[in-house]
């Protein structure tokens, strides 16, 4: 039976003080959904806006975007100088800043920023021969953005090959070529 054909009425309660939504007989999936709802509610309460409501749709804080870009550029400069640990620090700070965007900002923007930062951090790990860390970052970059991310597909394949996982590397690069098609680098 599909989810659209079935409906269960579940008893839920709202705490009068915190306005948190709970359920007595919550399954794991319901508990996760309620936690996400309560987290969204708490983040909306922290808005510093005279009306107390979130700003209109799709507002992007230009300062945060500029700071994420500046951190990425600083990481790129350190990478070019051969200072790979410093580059990794800048990329990590950029990832952390991008992940702190409010929930109402476009998710596509966050995914774009994250995928680029993680792909660059993977390259810095590769330069230090930290193959496992590079593979993890490249994989996370691909998960954030599948199409148009040929470098991350290749970087994970290279890391897997360097770790002696040749079959996985070949399969990974093959999948990357299927996704990227003729656009792949």
Which role fits each region the language model picked out?
Residues 1-185:
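Alpha-helical tetratricopeptide repeat
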